[in-house]
Amino acid sequence: KAKAAILFEPPNERWELFKELYRGYFSTECPAAIVTRDWLKLGFQGDHPERDLRGGGILSLELINDFAARENHSVKDMEKEGNDFFFAVSSINISFFMKKFFHLQTLTSRADHDHRELCSRLALKNFCRLLLSNRNAYADLHRLFLLHLYHTIWMGLKRTGSNITLLNFNQAFDTLREKVIRTFNDR
């Protein structure tokens, strides 16, 4: 929960995480200021990747790095031309969803409470059980959610032959969200 509360504030020592991600994906050193159009190839929205983190905070970046290190072949597949999938932005969206859903977001006022975005007591209990049995459960869940979003949901939509683009991302993400809710509410 502590990491979920840390928002990303550049420039700082956390830029090293961006540089690590860059080295891992491009097999070369990252520009000193980390500003480069190369970030678009990893699914960021622009050449300043820190701008995409917003409410996801530093935890989002750590989860992107974890995923890229463990699933480098999947990242390269996600970013192939024609797949129209934005790896980094999708990962950040999943991170932010998990942060809110599993009650890890610091709420500053009653207005921040949108109970539709919070998991049920049963789902939270199931999540806590998982954390007790697996120290890396949070990162593992993020990885599984992102793989499922891409391979099953997104590529499934692409295989239907319809013209699926970034504009269909919310539809795909809603499908993932519904599956997560159903899964964690299962006894």
Q: What does each of the following model-derived ranges do?
A:
Residues 1-187:
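Extended acidic/polar regulatory tracts at the flanks of large eukaryotic scaffold/adaptor proteins
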